[in-house]
């Protein structure tokens, strides 16, 4: 039965991974250009809770310190073993092999199939798989592989590690800190549990590798293969998959990744369009624009802004302060109409300057969004250009030779026509020869 379950899981994962292989390589090249470091900016439409919980498309997830039940089973976090494909494998310093089995890391076993795995402080959920690594990249292919520095052995047997034994089948697993129960029983995690439709993976400090899933490293680049990546401080949520990270979750409508200090090829032009509108509305009411409001509304654009644009931002608050001081000076004298007119003029000039600043920032961010696409498409265009260049060179060479040898070519063609006429006598000629003889 164990082998059958493992084979079924392998087939399901292979079927899901095949259509994503084409797009994964291109996006990995594009996303791998920039390393990520720094803070994660949140999308304006993202709903965040103080504990860092995410809502998923099919199922909700519970926040930081609350346990939840999964669709098939509730799962245990950091120091509890999970079962994979009816098999739980535990290890501390052993590396894992991939077969059709899930492999566990330092203090936990990962569970594949229809079982979910939770991390230390966060919960994650994905359509086929959810990966919630703390400082690691996620890897699955119908298999949860969770190595730290050590080999993991595969088989149809449950393997025990230094501190925690794991039981396979429908048996309860007891670990160092928390007992893990399988079946339809609820499992109590240390800090939180997550729900998953198919699979949740919860490595602590371990890299997971995926054939069809994104990797979410702490200081590494985000890669997407039609999947969302959730870094440490901002997990992203997509219609197909969601990956959650350490503290705070992000919701993204189909394939909008959250990033740290680098952008992904996919951008939200709608955000850039809606941003100036929201800013102009605020300017009409207040006559000024706070940089914090712009940062929160722009969401991901804060990470994309280049140093010159940051200087533009820093100049904007000073421009706002000057009109305020002028307005305060104008309020001193008790003259009626002249101060009011001056206030209106100053507020109008400040609003126009802020509008220009926001427009320049939005256009700059749009350009920054286009740069990764340009760099990604540059290789493809260069390859196409090379092909066109080769074909053009061949055509030029042929035409050049034909032009200088046109007399020979014409003579050859004419000789061929004449030879056909002479070498093919008609049937009537044969009949005449027969009659004469």
Curated annotation (Swiss-Prot):
Biased segments, Basic and acidic residues type: 197-221, 239-249, 310-324, 337-346, 353-370
Stretches assigned to the Cytoplasmic side: 403-437
Organism: Homo sapiens (Human)
Membrane topology per record: Single-pass type I membrane protein
GO cellular component, one term: Golgi apparatus
UniProt subcellular location: Cell membrane; Golgi apparatus, trans-Golgi network membrane
Region of interest (Disordered), ranges: 27-377
Keyword annotations from UniProtKB, A to Z: Cell membrane, Glycoprotein, Golgi apparatus, Membrane, Phosphoprotein, Repeat, Signal, Transmembrane, Transmembrane helix
Annotated positions of the Phosphoserine modification: 71, 221, 298, 351
Protein name: Trans-Golgi network integral membrane protein 2
Phosphothreonine PTM sites in chain numbering: 302
